Amino acid sequence: MTIYLIRHGKTEANEKRLYCGSTDLPLSEKGREELSQIHYDIKNVRFLTSGMKRTDETLKILFGGVPFDTDPRFREVDFGTFEMHSYEQLKDTPEYQAWITGDNEVNIPPGGESGEQMRKRVLDAFDEIKEDTVLICHGGVIAAIMAHLFPEENKTRYDWQPKNGCGYRLDLCSSQLKCSNRTSASNEWWTKRLRFVPIFASRRTS
């Protein structure tokens, strides 16, 4: 079984470096333009999104009008009252300091959810995937999955976050999970684990 984890394209919040999890933003113009330059040659799979505007729109740009399913458990973490605010706007508030200086895997932002709460719902949903699937979701969601699957890498969830429009390919074969990461800079998948065959994406020509 092969699972592709692809992060949605850029939004206005990404460009302005704002906390954006539960806020249902569409892609920005720049995000749409960047995605229009990417082509993934992936066929005969199930397509799945988190159901948020930015993931649904990303899927339609990358794969056209393919039928797809949605699962809200793959939504980004809810930052509560920190949503749509920047670090500079929040850094001096006691609520933000209590969250950012502690264990924010456990700490809950006001009106939001902790990283651990998000991780549990995401992994519950991920465990239900039983066929070749393209999952268009969010940076924090992908990072939570990768950190869970590859603890031996000693990476934080933040280290695992891919760039917008990029992601990972996971192959589950003979009970062994292998992984590769696609970067838009090189426009290819680079090998992350032993004996993994890289796949190459091409630039969209029309």
Protein language model features and the residues they cover:
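Active-site-proximal alpha-helix that buttresses catalytic centers in soluble enzyme cores
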Residues: 2-69
